[in-house]
């Protein structure tokens, strides 16, 4: 999992990018 995930935004742990 990414260590820089934001609690307010769902993250795509496969792409390591904010899923927005």
UniProtKB/Swiss-Prot annotation:
GO terms for cellular component: mitochondrial matrix. Its main location: mitochondrion. Its cofactor is Mn(2+). Coiled coil: none annotated. InterPro entries: Mn/Fe_SOD_N_sf (IPR036324). It catalyses: 2 superoxide + 2 H(+) = H2O2 + O2. GO terms for molecular function: metal ion binding; superoxide dismutase activity. Its EC number is 1.15.1.1. Binds 1 Mn(2+) ion per subunit. Belongs to the iron/manganese superoxide dismutase family. This is Superoxide dismutase [Mn], mitochondrial. Destroys superoxide anion radicals which are normally produced within the cells and which are toxic to biological systems. It is found in: Mitochondrion matrix. Keywords: Manganese, Metal-binding, Mitochondrion, Oxidoreductase. It is an enzyme of class 1 (oxidoreductase). Homotetramer. The gene is SODA.
């Amino acid at each position: 999992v990414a260590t820089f995930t934001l609690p307010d935004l769902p993250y795509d742990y496969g792409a390591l990018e904010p899923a927005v």
